[in-house]
Amino acid sequence: MKVRQKMKKPLIIAAIVFGVGFLSIIGYGLYLYMSVNSTASEIHEPLDREFSEKRGAQVDVEGKQPMSFLLAGVDSTGETHAGRSDTIIVLTVNPNDKSIKMVSIPRDTRTEIVGRGTIEKINHAYAYGGVQMTVDTVENFLNIPIDHYVSINMEGFKGIVDALGGVNVNNEFAFNSGGHEFGEGPLFLNGEEALAYSRMRKQDARGDFGRNDRQRQIVEAVIKEGAQLSSITKAGSILDAVGESVRTDLTLSEMWAIQSNYKEAGGNVEQLALVGPSQRIDGLSYVVISDEDRNNMTQLLREHLELD
Protein backbone atom coordinates (compact mmCIF):
# COMPACT_ATOMS: atom_id res chain seq x y z
CA MET A 1 0.00 0.00 0.00
CA LYS A 2 1.36 3.39 -0.99
CA VAL A 3 1.60 5.88 1.74
CA ARG A 4 0.92 9.50 0.82
CA GLN A 5 3.30 11.76 2.67
CA LYS A 6 1.94 14.98 4.01
CA MET A 7 3.52 18.11 2.56
CA LYS A 8 4.98 20.21 5.28
CA LYS A 9 3.02 23.38 5.98
CA PRO A 10 5.93 25.78 5.23
CA LEU A 11 6.32 24.20 1.78
CA ILE A 12 2.60 24.57 1.09
CA ILE A 13 2.74 28.25 2.05
CA ALA A 14 5.84 28.78 -0.09
CA ALA A 15 4.17 27.11 -3.06
CA ILE A 16 1.07 29.29 -2.68
CA VAL A 17 3.14 32.46 -2.36
CA PHE A 18 5.21 31.51 -5.42
CA GLY A 19 2.09 30.68 -7.40
CA VAL A 20 0.34 33.92 -6.51
CA GLY A 21 3.49 35.89 -7.25
CA PHE A 22 3.97 34.16 -10.59
CA LEU A 23 0.36 34.80 -11.61
CA SER A 24 0.69 38.42 -10.48
CA ILE A 25 3.75 38.88 -12.68
CA ILE A 26 1.94 37.36 -15.66
CA GLY A 27 -1.11 39.50 -14.97
CA TYR A 28 0.93 42.68 -14.64
CA GLY A 29 2.89 41.83 -17.76
CA LEU A 30 -0.37 41.37 -19.68
CA TYR A 31 -1.67 44.64 -18.24
CA LEU A 32 1.48 46.47 -19.36
CA TYR A 33 1.32 44.90 -22.81
CA MET A 34 -2.28 46.00 -23.25
CA SER A 35 -1.53 49.42 -21.75
CA VAL A 36 1.44 49.98 -24.06
CA ASN A 37 -0.64 49.07 -27.11
CA SER A 38 -3.49 51.29 -25.95
CA THR A 39 -1.19 54.24 -25.23
CA ALA A 40 0.67 53.84 -28.54
CA SER A 41 -2.65 53.92 -30.37
CA GLU A 42 -3.85 56.93 -28.38
CA ILE A 43 -0.78 59.07 -29.03
CA HIS A 44 -0.23 58.06 -32.67
CA GLU A 45 -0.96 60.89 -35.11
CA PRO A 46 0.90 60.38 -38.40
CA LEU A 47 2.10 63.15 -40.66
CA ASP A 48 0.62 63.58 -44.12
CA ARG A 49 3.58 61.88 -45.79
CA GLU A 50 5.48 58.59 -45.77
CA PHE A 51 8.90 60.15 -45.32
CA SER A 52 10.76 63.44 -45.61
CA GLU A 53 11.39 64.75 -49.11
CA LYS A 54 14.84 65.79 -47.92
CA ARG A 55 15.73 62.13 -47.35
CA GLY A 56 13.80 60.40 -50.12
CA ALA A 57 13.14 57.17 -48.23
CA GLN A 58 12.09 55.91 -44.84
CA VAL A 59 14.75 55.64 -42.17
CA ASP A 60 16.07 52.11 -41.70
CA VAL A 61 15.57 51.77 -37.95
CA GLU A 62 16.56 48.11 -37.87
CA GLY A 63 19.73 49.01 -39.78
CA LYS A 64 20.57 51.67 -37.19
CA GLN A 65 20.48 54.56 -39.66
CA PRO A 66 20.93 57.98 -37.98
CA MET A 67 17.62 59.79 -37.64
CA SER A 68 16.13 63.10 -36.51
CA PHE A 69 13.22 64.19 -34.34
CA LEU A 70 11.35 67.43 -33.82
CA LEU A 71 10.28 68.02 -30.23
CA ALA A 72 7.51 70.63 -30.07
CA GLY A 73 6.47 71.78 -26.61
CA VAL A 74 3.08 73.51 -26.59
CA ASP A 75 2.68 75.76 -23.57
CA SER A 76 -1.07 75.46 -23.24
CA THR A 77 -3.62 74.43 -20.64
CA GLY A 78 -5.94 73.17 -23.36
CA GLU A 79 -5.64 70.35 -25.84
CA THR A 80 -2.26 69.09 -26.94
CA HIS A 81 -2.56 70.75 -30.35
CA ALA A 82 -3.79 74.13 -29.17
CA GLY A 83 -1.64 77.25 -29.08
CA ARG A 84 1.87 77.91 -30.34
CA SER A 85 4.98 75.80 -29.97
CA ASP A 86 6.98 77.72 -27.38
CA THR A 87 9.61 74.97 -27.32
CA ILE A 88 11.22 73.86 -30.59
CA ILE A 89 14.05 71.36 -30.26
CA VAL A 90 15.64 69.24 -32.98
CA LEU A 91 17.29 65.97 -31.97
CA THR A 92 19.64 64.07 -34.25
CA VAL A 93 20.45 60.57 -33.06
CA ASN A 94 23.43 58.59 -34.34
CA PRO A 95 23.51 55.02 -33.00
CA ASN A 96 26.83 54.33 -34.70
CA ASP A 97 28.83 56.81 -32.62
CA LYS A 98 26.24 56.55 -29.81
CA SER A 99 25.48 60.26 -29.57
CA ILE A 100 22.63 62.76 -29.66
CA LYS A 101 22.77 66.40 -30.70
CA MET A 102 20.01 68.56 -29.23
CA VAL A 103 19.44 71.94 -30.89
CA SER A 104 17.14 74.66 -29.57
CA ILE A 105 15.53 77.02 -32.06
CA PRO A 106 14.32 80.29 -30.49
CA ARG A 107 10.54 80.58 -30.76
CA ASP A 108 10.85 84.14 -32.12
CA THR A 109 13.21 83.12 -34.95
CA ARG A 110 12.35 85.00 -38.15
CA THR A 111 11.89 82.60 -41.06
CA GLU A 112 9.59 81.53 -43.87
CA ILE A 113 6.47 79.68 -42.76
CA VAL A 114 6.20 76.87 -45.30
CA GLY A 115 2.66 76.48 -46.59
CA ARG A 116 1.81 80.15 -46.11
CA GLY A 117 4.65 81.87 -47.94
CA THR A 118 5.06 84.46 -45.19
CA ILE A 119 8.06 85.55 -43.12
CA GLU A 120 7.12 85.31 -39.47
CA LYS A 121 8.16 83.93 -36.09
CA ILE A 122 8.85 80.22 -36.41
CA ASN A 123 6.44 79.27 -33.62
CA HIS A 124 3.53 80.70 -35.64
CA ALA A 125 3.74 77.60 -37.85
CA TYR A 126 2.16 75.48 -35.14
CA ALA A 127 -0.75 77.87 -34.68
CA TYR A 128 -1.41 77.94 -38.44
CA GLY A 129 -0.92 74.30 -39.38
CA GLY A 130 -0.09 72.23 -36.34
CA VAL A 131 2.87 69.92 -36.22
CA GLN A 132 2.80 69.26 -39.99
CA MET A 133 3.51 72.89 -40.85
CA THR A 134 6.07 73.11 -38.05
CA VAL A 135 7.96 70.08 -39.39
CA ASP A 136 7.92 71.50 -42.93
CA THR A 137 9.10 74.91 -41.69
CA VAL A 138 11.93 73.52 -39.54
CA GLU A 139 13.08 71.26 -42.39
CA ASN A 140 13.23 74.26 -44.70
CA PHE A 141 14.98 76.41 -42.09
CA LEU A 142 17.74 73.90 -41.27
CA ASN A 143 17.83 72.04 -44.61
CA ILE A 144 17.74 68.63 -42.93
CA PRO A 145 15.09 65.91 -42.91
CA ILE A 146 12.85 65.69 -39.86
CA ASP A 147 12.09 61.98 -39.72
CA HIS A 148 9.70 61.96 -36.77
CA TYR A 149 8.09 64.32 -34.30
CA VAL A 150 7.01 64.30 -30.68
CA SER A 151 4.53 66.97 -29.54
CA ILE A 152 4.15 67.58 -25.81
CA ASN A 153 1.62 69.65 -23.91
CA MET A 154 3.94 71.26 -21.37
CA GLU A 155 1.20 71.37 -18.73
CA GLY A 156 0.96 67.60 -18.98
CA PHE A 157 4.74 67.20 -19.17
CA LYS A 158 4.99 67.58 -15.41
CA GLY A 159 3.03 64.34 -15.10
CA ILE A 160 5.76 62.52 -17.02
CA VAL A 161 8.44 63.92 -14.72
CA ASP A 162 6.44 62.85 -11.67
CA ALA A 163 5.89 59.39 -13.13
CA LEU A 164 9.65 59.02 -13.56
CA GLY A 165 10.10 59.96 -9.91
CA GLY A 166 11.70 63.36 -10.65
CA VAL A 167 14.76 64.55 -12.57
CA ASN A 168 18.19 65.97 -11.79
CA VAL A 169 19.50 69.25 -13.25
CA ASN A 170 22.38 71.61 -12.56
CA ASN A 171 21.23 75.22 -12.09
CA GLU A 172 23.65 77.98 -13.11
CA PHE A 173 22.26 80.64 -10.76
CA ALA A 174 19.61 81.01 -8.04
CA PHE A 175 16.15 82.33 -8.97
CA ASN A 176 12.46 82.13 -8.10
CA SER A 177 9.78 80.93 -10.50
CA GLY A 178 6.19 79.80 -10.16
CA GLY A 179 6.31 80.01 -6.38
CA HIS A 180 9.42 77.85 -6.17
CA GLU A 181 12.97 78.76 -5.15
CA PHE A 182 15.77 77.25 -7.21
CA GLY A 183 19.23 77.40 -5.67
CA GLU A 184 22.48 77.37 -7.59
CA GLY A 185 24.00 73.97 -8.29
CA PRO A 186 22.57 70.42 -8.48
CA LEU A 187 18.79 70.20 -8.04
CA PHE A 188 16.28 67.37 -7.89
CA LEU A 189 12.93 68.49 -9.33
CA ASN A 190 9.42 67.07 -9.32
CA GLY A 191 7.05 67.71 -12.22
CA GLU A 192 5.66 71.06 -11.07
CA GLU A 193 9.14 72.32 -10.19
CA ALA A 194 10.56 71.13 -13.53
CA LEU A 195 7.86 73.02 -15.42
CA ALA A 196 8.46 76.23 -13.43
CA TYR A 197 12.22 75.82 -13.87
CA SER A 198 11.93 75.45 -17.65
CA ARG A 199 9.58 78.42 -18.06
CA MET A 200 11.63 81.12 -16.32
CA ARG A 201 13.18 83.79 -18.56
CA LYS A 202 12.60 87.25 -17.02
CA GLN A 203 15.25 86.80 -14.31
CA ASP A 204 17.79 85.55 -16.84
CA ALA A 205 19.89 88.16 -18.64
CA ARG A 206 19.85 85.84 -21.68
CA GLY A 207 16.04 85.90 -21.84
CA ASP A 208 14.63 83.23 -24.16
CA PHE A 209 18.10 81.81 -24.79
CA GLY A 210 18.48 81.02 -21.09
CA ARG A 211 14.97 79.60 -21.05
CA ASN A 212 15.89 77.37 -23.99
CA ASP A 213 18.93 76.09 -22.07
CA ARG A 214 16.77 75.07 -19.13
CA GLN A 215 14.25 73.40 -21.42
CA ARG A 216 17.05 71.35 -22.99
CA GLN A 217 18.26 70.43 -19.50
CA ILE A 218 14.85 69.07 -18.55
CA VAL A 219 14.48 67.15 -21.82
CA GLU A 220 17.94 65.61 -21.44
CA ALA A 221 17.19 64.70 -17.82
CA VAL A 222 13.95 62.97 -18.87
CA ILE A 223 15.79 61.06 -21.62
CA LYS A 224 18.45 59.87 -19.18
CA GLU A 225 15.99 58.99 -16.44
CA GLY A 226 13.78 57.12 -18.87
CA ALA A 227 16.74 55.16 -20.24
CA GLN A 228 17.80 54.16 -16.72
CA LEU A 229 14.30 53.20 -15.59
CA SER A 230 14.67 49.99 -13.59
CA SER A 231 11.39 49.69 -11.70
CA ILE A 232 8.62 48.12 -13.77
CA THR A 233 6.10 49.45 -11.27
CA LYS A 234 6.59 52.95 -12.73
CA ALA A 235 5.49 51.87 -16.19
CA GLY A 236 1.75 52.23 -15.61
CA SER A 237 1.91 55.82 -14.37
CA ILE A 238 4.35 56.75 -17.13
CA LEU A 239 2.01 55.38 -19.78
CA ASP A 240 -0.92 57.30 -18.29
CA ALA A 241 1.08 60.56 -18.32
CA VAL A 242 2.31 59.99 -21.87
CA GLY A 243 -1.19 59.25 -23.12
CA GLU A 244 -2.49 62.53 -21.73
CA SER A 245 0.22 64.86 -23.01
CA VAL A 246 2.15 63.36 -25.94
CA ARG A 247 1.43 62.93 -29.64
CA THR A 248 3.81 61.39 -32.20
CA ASP A 249 3.93 59.84 -35.66
CA LEU A 250 5.95 56.89 -34.34
CA THR A 251 4.26 53.50 -34.42
CA LEU A 252 4.62 51.02 -31.58
CA SER A 253 6.94 48.81 -33.65
CA GLU A 254 9.15 51.82 -34.41
CA MET A 255 9.25 52.72 -30.72
CA TRP A 256 10.38 49.21 -29.80
CA ALA A 257 13.04 49.24 -32.53
CA ILE A 258 14.35 52.64 -31.41
CA GLN A 259 14.45 51.49 -27.79
CA SER A 260 16.44 48.44 -28.86
CA ASN A 261 18.80 49.97 -31.42
CA TYR A 262 19.26 53.61 -30.37
CA LYS A 263 19.10 53.69 -26.57
CA GLU A 264 22.87 53.75 -26.03
CA ALA A 265 23.03 57.16 -27.72
CA GLY A 266 21.13 58.62 -24.74
CA GLY A 267 24.27 58.53 -22.63
CA ASN A 268 26.04 61.11 -24.81
CA VAL A 269 23.92 64.22 -25.39
CA GLU A 270 25.45 67.42 -26.77
CA GLN A 271 23.36 70.54 -26.19
CA LEU A 272 23.49 73.17 -28.92
CA ALA A 273 21.59 76.38 -29.64
CA LEU A 274 21.01 78.79 -32.46
CA VAL A 275 21.41 82.33 -31.19
CA GLY A 276 21.10 85.73 -32.76
CA PRO A 277 20.34 89.36 -32.01
CA SER A 278 16.84 90.59 -31.29
CA GLN A 279 15.61 92.99 -33.98
CA ARG A 280 12.40 94.98 -34.22
CA ILE A 281 10.85 94.64 -37.68
CA ASP A 282 7.45 96.08 -38.61
CA GLY A 283 6.70 96.63 -34.94
CA LEU A 284 7.50 93.05 -33.89
CA SER A 285 10.53 91.66 -32.08
CA TYR A 286 12.34 88.81 -33.84
CA VAL A 287 15.44 86.72 -33.27
CA VAL A 288 17.47 86.93 -36.48
CA ILE A 289 19.80 83.99 -37.09
CA SER A 290 22.60 84.83 -39.51
CA ASP A 291 22.96 82.72 -42.66
CA GLU A 292 26.48 81.78 -41.55
CA ASP A 293 25.34 80.44 -38.18
CA ARG A 294 22.40 78.62 -39.71
CA ASN A 295 24.54 77.04 -42.43
CA ASN A 296 27.15 75.96 -39.88
CA MET A 297 24.47 74.27 -37.82
CA THR A 298 23.03 72.62 -40.92
CA GLN A 299 26.43 71.20 -41.84
CA LEU A 300 26.98 69.89 -38.31
CA LEU A 301 23.60 68.16 -38.22
CA ARG A 302 23.86 66.72 -41.72
CA GLU A 303 27.24 65.21 -40.84
CA HIS A 304 25.76 63.74 -37.66
CA LEU A 305 22.95 62.24 -39.75
CA GLU A 306 25.60 60.90 -42.15
CA LEU A 307 23.96 62.68 -45.08
CA ASP A 308 27.12 64.36 -46.39
Predicted regions and their residues:
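Entry/capping segment at the start of metal-dependent catalytic domains
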Residues: 6-97, 257, 289
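C-terminal solvent-exposed extensions
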Residues: 45-48, 52-59, 65-66, 118, ...
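Stable alpha-helical elements in mature extracytoplasmic
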Residues: 118, 130-138, 153-160, 194, ...
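Flexible, polar/acidic helix-loop-strand segments at domain edges
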Residues: 160-237
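Amphipathic, coiled-coil-like alpha-helical scaffolding segments used for oligomerization/assembly
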Residues: 123-180
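Extracytoplasmic
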Residues: 64-67, 83-88, 97-105, 117, ...
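Sec-exported extracytoplasmic/periplasmic mature domains
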Residues: 95, 110, 114, 127, ...
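Second-shell loop/turn segments in exported
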Residues: 76-80, 120-128, 143-148, 202-209, ...
